[in-house]
Every structure is written in C-alpha cells, then in structure tokens.
Regions:
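Alpha-helical coupling/stalk and coiled-coil linker elements that connect catalytic or binding modules
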Residues: 1-61, 77-82, 113-114, 129-292
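Long, charged all-alpha helical bundle/coiled-coil segments in cytosolic proteins
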Residues: 3-7, 51-122, 127
Length: 292
C-alpha cells in the first residue's frame, strides 16, 4: 500500500498541504494523514473541506497562529502544579486564537455547515485570556499591572533604590572620597549597591566587601551609610518574588480549573486548521470538488 502512496506522490501533496497550516503541531499531523477507503468517511471529509472553502470565499480565512501544544501544561495545572511564564504565555496565545475563531464565526451566523458543530463547541474564556495577556510581559517578567500589590512593591523598590543611588552619587563625587575610588561610579554586586574602591584604600571606606576584581586591584564595597537601605530593598525584593509566585499560582489554578474544555478546544482548533488548510490549497490549485 505504501508503494501505491508513493506512486501517487501522496507525500508531496501532504507536504504542500502542510505549508498551508500555521502551527507546527498541525503541520506534523497533516504529514501523517492516511487515505480512507470508507466511502462515507471520504464523503464527510470532502464536505467539510468544501464548507471550509465556501466560508473562506465568503468571509475570508479565519486567523490561525503558531500555537503550541497546551495539553501538557493544562494537565499539570489541573494536578496543582504552578506553570512557567512560557507555558502561561502559550496558553494565553491559544485562548486568543479561540476568541478569534469565535469572533470570525459570528459573522457567519445563520449559515449551517458541516463545520458548525466545531465552532459551536469552542469555549471562549476572555477572563483567563485577559488575565494572562495583561499580566505577562515575557517568559521572564510579569507586568506591574499583574496585581496592585506587585505594583506597590516595585514602586517602593524604585524609590528606595533611587534614594540609595543619590546618596552614593554624593559620596563618589566628593573630592575627599574620589582619590580612594578606582572609578567614580555606582554598581551592583549580589543585588546590592556598591562602589569600586582601590584595594590599598579599603580601610578608608567603611563598609562591607562584596566582591573583588579579577586583578585584585579593586574591592566592591557597600558603604555602611547605605547598608540599612540596601537591606530594606532586599526585603522588598523577597516580597516581590513571593507576590510573583502567588500570581503565577493563581493563574495556574485558574488554568487547571478549565483544563478539560481547553484540551477539547485545542483538538477542535487543530481540526479546523487542517480543513481550512485543505481549502486554501484547493483554492491555490484551482481544484474542483470530486463527486463520489
């Protein structure tokens, strides 16, 4: 049978079809499609592809994205695990696609097709979609708007950090101090503000040594005048991390509570994308619906 597939160049057709899909998972599924020899199945598949073509011709092709497989993350969240920001971002992108497909299909109201059941099964979740989209900047950072508490903590860190910098700026600009410094700058070591002091003058700047240069010529000292303020900043940074973990946990729990409908939607989205990919390829090839 595989030899017959090769003679028919099925692999080349499937490769062309995969190029009309948007997500990697969908492309891989397309390449694994096998012909059916059941006439009812064949007729059903042709009808769905034909309906996708008709809808695309009237309303344009719905927008698909390169969504990632969200099933594993959704199941982990369902079991109580906190997800990574990357996993949450992928889920947010997926939920946006579900919303987009639902919006697109709303313009087709009143038109019944063999694809109607797929669209009507989609579970739009704007609350979770907006929560994730508004809270996450990147896979490494939450937005200040993720929670009022996070925003307040970060404002406090910013204010206290600015005060420490201003105090150290005065120190490094003082003529009596400059001769002890390797450079007139404020830098960071171990998350604390320090100044670069020449090793031979370490006793002239009272403070805590956090690091040395590769050559040993410079000590990075945290002046005693800012130790307490740096401690306060560190406490705030710990509070910030705890709040970040709380927010991620809250979003993960919400994802877990909707895991089953999301996994169902994921399969529906991939199925729809394949039918519209077939319709797009058919349009490009100026293909005609076969009569069986």
């Amino acid at each position: 049978m595989k030899k017959d597939y090769k003679k028919l160049e099925l692999d080349k057709i499937l490769d062309l079809l995969s190029q009309n899909a948007y997500c990697d998972v969908c492309r891989e599924r397309i390449k694994k499609i096998k012909p059916s020899f059941d006439i009812d199945t064949v007729r059903t598949e042709i009808a769905k592809t034909d309906d996708a073509f008709t809808l695309s011709s009237k309303f344009g092709t719905p927008k698909f994205y390169n969504i990632k497989d969200i099933c594993f993350g959704a199941k982990r969240a369902q079991q109580g695990s906190s997800l990574s920001l990357r996993e949450l971002m992928d889920i947010g992108m997926f939920l946006r696609e579900v919303s987009g497909l639902d919006d697109w299909y709303s313009q087709c109201s009143g038109i019944q097709t063999s694809l109607t059941e797929y669209f009507e099964q989609l579970s739009v979740n704007k609350h979770l979609e907006n929560m994730i989209t508004n809270a996450i900047i990147s896979e490494e950072e939450l937005a200040d708007s993720a929670s009022p508490q996070l925003a307040a903590i970060r404002r406090s860190i910013q204010r206290k950090s600015l005060a420490v910098r201003e105090r150290l700026d005065k120190l490094i600009k003082s003529q009596s101090t400059q001769k002890y410094l390797q450079e007139s700058l404020v830098t960071m070591r171990d998350g604390r503000f320090v100044v670069p002091v020449k090793t031979e003058y370490k006793s002239e700047i009272s403070g805590l040594v956090h690091d040395t240069s590769a050559t040993g010529a410079t000590l990075f000292i945290e002046p005693m005048a800012v130790v307490e303020a740096n401690n306060e900043i560190r406490v705030l940074q710990i509070e910030e991390q705890k709040e970040i973990e709380r927010i991620i946990k809250e979003m993960s729990e919400l994802v877990g509570s909707f895991a089953e409908p999301m996994i169902n939607d994921y399969e529906i989205v991939l199925t729809l994308e394949i039918y519209f990919a077939k319709a797009n390829l058919g349009a490009k090839m100026k293909a005609v619906t076969p009569v069986i």
